[in-house]
Amino acid sequence: HSVKELQSVGIQPDVLILRTEKHLDEGILKKVASFCNVDIDCVIQSEDLPSIYEVPVNMQNQGLDTAILRKMGEPIGEKPALGPWKTFLDRRNKATETVNIGLVGKYDLQDAYKSIRESLSHAGTYNDHKVNITFINSEYLTEENVAEQLKGQDGIVICPGFGQRGIEGKIIAAHYTRTHDIPTFGICLGM
């Protein structure tokens, strides 16, 4: 439908990337190519994968890089070296050790601390560890429940945030981790 809309205003796509939950068979790809007036090798699947980091390798394996270069009239040389990227994926997938990290913050939205989560994940991969991240809402941290809330965490990250809301819980978490020798990284309040 989106391709039809593009074509109705005079735009003809050169490459289609299809989001899909599972691998599509050749017949479906040929049908899409035919109905959308694109070459079959320019219909690329972006199927659900265990990790977003596998997408570049999957796209290259389907020839997306070659298709784009060809459509742009650029010379097609050697494939980009994805060796370091594949090594990263291999380390990520084969990590056997696990570390539990608690994120103490006040924002419930999963994406609020996305860069922190990804940084921890990358650091874990670099150190051959899987990182289990538990969100701990600082608004509900008290002296009475802090031990239970931080139980089982190998380390704590105290996340940034604006305004007064949740600050008391962050201070309680910082005090508890300092007095109980739990490694802590504070990204706010001058920590």
Put a short name on every predicted segment.
Residues 1-191:
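N-terminal beta1-alpha1 cap of cysteine-dependent amidohydrolase-like domains
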